[in-house]
Amino acid sequence: MLVAADGAGSVCRQLLSVPVTQQHSDEVSMAFCLTLSVPHQQRAWQRFTQQGTLAILPMREANQVRLVWTCSAALAQDVVGWQPEQWVQHVNSVYRGYCPAVVSARLLQQFPLRISQASRQHVGRCLLMGNAARTFYPTTAQGFNLALRDVAALAQLLVQAKQNQRAIDATLIAEFVAWRQPDQTRVMQITAAMNTVFGLQLPGWSVLRGLGLSAVELVPFLKPRLAQRLLGYSGRVPD
């Protein structure tokens, strides 16, 4: 079998003639390399602001992290022209009290945000995985987490097939797709909803949003249920 995990511009997907539905956005994601004042201890942080969504992800080096800042194209055009000191100042103002202080920042790249979905996930014994199959809003690392669950599920099926001396054929791959599709659809819906909820700037909306977040925090069953869905523990999960 062929597992195609070659990214959003997948050459394998093109060679397989799998159509892709794309939803273009007026948003841009910018990636920065940040240096923290103290080690990150493998923690990640995300903030939703009026200037967009900012996610900080730990890297291998103890004090190095990546910042992915998703915002409107108009704002991004201004931000890329800032001096490094301005990036540091803005990130520290957004994350004050939530994560270690940023001492330096360097812009790595920027790219337009596109939401895409392949019309099918497999052709025969060829399987599309990760961004080759779908891309969506970069919210709470859900795309990465989903890909890890997909890989774990595929590995489980392949191990079971070998143990049972079963052929690794199109039928087995179809079983994988049927298993994983509900989780994939759920994550796409959740990330789209979160982007809408935190992106709207209507009068009074921030108050309603705050009340909703307070309800999640206070109502006993809401927070665990939401966490289960975001962590991928709802429905059938890989062993």
Describe each model-derived feature in a short phrase.
Residues 1-108:
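Conserved FAD-binding catalytic core of PHBH/FMO-like flavoproteins
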